[in-house]
């Protein structure tokens, strides 16, 4: 695409807040990352930059922020060359929030504000006035003395955004700001962004892999393989999928929705995408279709037309650029079809009804109760979701289940083993994939797999055979000699899951496994998980992405260490249009009830 003017009429192109002119960026060993990017952005616009892992989004954001010089081309900020004599001055016009929020975690909230105020050269009066305003805007006033490293993920996100806004920039650049953040915090962030874009005449550019967020923006730019492919409004991009979007429901609800979804998404001839939604599956067909054709293909399934979304349009366009991602996923499924039954454990097969049993589960850190009297059971082959806001107690519960944290009080059995007394024995049966992926970044992909295989007792020819299997299954063969730390996020996710599955665990624990992953990576990942569960592997997963809760057989929502609701996704969602709405309703109602209780007892 040679020239894109976002939010500008032809006679106003010269008034752009930010402009790229034939921007390229190459790096040694990685080749060309960005190629010929030309675009102009108007003020007072909210712009989404979307694309797959490795598309070049972060590189373009860092170039715009003045911290990574392009190999060729020009970057203009309000008509002036950014990488020239006025670099320092123009950088102050831009607020930048990187993926890790850019916080100093050993400093308190107040100290982070003071440090950023000093870096921006603000006066004492300006610092106090703006800090007060931003603390109120982000609801962080009560946490000024808390170290940033001890804030929940949602609070860190808000603090990072507040620090980026402290200088009152005219351009705000946010690189995947909601990764690992719960729906309540995401809602608050987008409220803040919309208010600032309108009130301060500010250009805001958000890099994201979440299409529901991109749909909230005025304009969307699709970046793939370093090229700017398409730009338009969310509505104009959605129109690329007109005539291809349907909703599918079982006429007799005999199977979980995720199994219907798994059946449909395997149809690479007729369907391009299939995602669980409410009581059925949201479909995207390969080319235009109609209800009658689909009914003939799938007897017993009822189809209705639905409006196309930005995500639908993006997937149609992406197939034109990069082909069909699902073909690779289909080739790798054989590994997962056999994984669960290869080394069947008598403790599990002998007690299929309850592989995990938790009763009155409590975890204390000193006087602080992180998990308070939690009860649940998980069956063999079940996908069980742990949901909750940042700081709700999910990860603490998760670590107790994995034997990584001692249980303070209550009962906990995993695969028939009392975890309170035999944590090491229980861990031998488990696979664990953490949200930070638990990889050794300095080791190559092959070295990571060899290390973990040895840790699981897979040595010699048996270990080599298993490593070869997972390299092929996860599409990692071409990356075998590459350092794990240099992999794109989606490939780090693949490697992390590969290490967790090397020893064919009977129970798989996944802690926010798709956080920040692009759409194909998420779809591919859940195909693997569904195949594992179908063949008997028990899966426990935490996620902040509510669409993924619909892949679960049952979900437990926690907040402040307490269990709020346990049931099927359909039961939890009852009365709400989406799982996002249901999650927010459950948590806010519980918080209001707790606030009322405290008033009554005070």
Question: Predicted segment positions?
Answer:
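Helix-to-loop junction immediately C-terminal to a conserved catalytic motif
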Residues: 65, 402
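The feature captures the beta-strand-to-loop junction immediately N-terminal to the Walker
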Residues: 50-52, 387-389
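ABC transporter nucleotide-binding domain
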Residues: 192-287, 527-541, 546-592
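Conserved ABC ATPase "signature" region
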Residues: 114, 118, 125-143, 450, ...
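Catalytic Walker B motif of ABC-type/P-loop ATPase nucleotide-binding domains
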Residues: 172-176, 508-511
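Conserved ABC transporter NBD signature motif
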Residues: 73-83, 89-90, 410-418, 425-426
């Amino acid at each position: 695409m040679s020239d894109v003017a976002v939010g500008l009429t032809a006679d106003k192109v010269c008034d752009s807040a930010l402009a790229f002119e034939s921007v390229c960026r190459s790096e040694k060993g990685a080749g060309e990352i960005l190629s010929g990017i030309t675009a102009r952005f108007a003020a007072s616009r909210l712009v989404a930059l979307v694309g797959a892992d490795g598309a070049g989004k972060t590189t373009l954001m860092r170039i715009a922020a003045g911290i990574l010089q392009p190999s060729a081309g020009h970057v203009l900020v309000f008509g002036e060359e950014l990488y020239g004599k006025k670099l320092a001055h123009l950088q102050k016009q831009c607020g930048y929030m990187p993926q890790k929020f850019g916080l100093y975690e050993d400093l308190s909230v107040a100290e982070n504000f003071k440090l950023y105020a000093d870096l921006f050269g603000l006066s004492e009066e300006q610092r106090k006035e703006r800090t007060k305003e931003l603390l109120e805007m982000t609801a962080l006033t009560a946490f000024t003395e808390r170290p940033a490293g001890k804030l929940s993920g949602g609070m860190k996100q808000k603090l990072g955004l507040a620090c980026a806004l402290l200088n009152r920039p005219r351009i705000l650049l946010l690189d995947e700001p909601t990764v690992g953040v719960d729906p309540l915090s995401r809602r608050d962030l987008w409220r803040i962004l919309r208010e600032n874009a309108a009130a301060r005449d500010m250009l805001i550019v958000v890099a994201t892999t979440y299409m529901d967020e991109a749909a909230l923006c005025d304009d969307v730019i699709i970046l793939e393989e370093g090229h700017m492919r398409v730009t338009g409004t969310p509505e104009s991009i959605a129109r690329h999928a007109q005539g291809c979007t349907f909703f599918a429901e079982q006429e007799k609800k005999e199977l979980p929705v995720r199994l219907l979804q798994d059946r449909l998404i395997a149809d690479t001839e007729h369907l391009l995408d299939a995602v669980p939604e409410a009581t059925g599956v949201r479909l995207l067909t390969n080319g235009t279709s109609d209800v009658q054709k689909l009914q003939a293909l799938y007897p017993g399934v009822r189809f209705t037309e639905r409006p196309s979304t930005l995500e639908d349009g993006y997937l149609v366009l992406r197939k034109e650029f990069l082909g069909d991602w699902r073909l690779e996923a289909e080739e790798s499924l054989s590994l997962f079809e056999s994984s669960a039954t290869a080394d069947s454990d008598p403790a599990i097969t002998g007690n299929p009804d309850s592989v995990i049993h938790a009763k009155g589960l409590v975890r204390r850190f000193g006087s602080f109760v992180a998990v308070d009297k939690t009860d649940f059971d998980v069956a063999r082959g079940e996908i069980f979701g742990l949901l909750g806001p940042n700081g709700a107690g999910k990860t603490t519960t998760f670590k107790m289940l994995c034997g990584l944290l001692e249980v303070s009080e209550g009962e906990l059995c995993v695969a028939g083993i009392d975890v309170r007394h035999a944590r090491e024995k229980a861990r031998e049966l488990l696979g664990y994939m953490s949200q930070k992926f638990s990889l050794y970044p300095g080791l190559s992909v092959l070295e990571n797999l060899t290390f973990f295989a040895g840790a699981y007792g897979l040595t010699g020819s048996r270990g080599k055979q298993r490593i070869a299997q997972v390299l092929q299954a996860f599409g990692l063969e071409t990356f075998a000699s590459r350092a794990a730390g240099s992999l794109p996020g989606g490939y780090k996710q693949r490697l992390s899951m590969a290490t967790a599955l090397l020893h064919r665990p009977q129970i798989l624990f996944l802690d926010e496994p798709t956080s920040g992953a692009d759409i194909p990576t998420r779809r591919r990942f859940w195909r693997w998980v569904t195949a594992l569960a179908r063949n008997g592997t028990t899966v426990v997963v935490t996620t902040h992405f509510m669409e993924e809760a619909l892949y679960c057989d049952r979900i437990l929502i926690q907040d402040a260490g307490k269990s709020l609701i346990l049931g099927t996704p359909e039961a939890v969602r009852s009365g709400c249009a989406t799982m996002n709405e249901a999650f927010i309703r459950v948590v806010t109602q519980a918080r209001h009830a707790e606030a009322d209780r405290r008033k009554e007892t005070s």
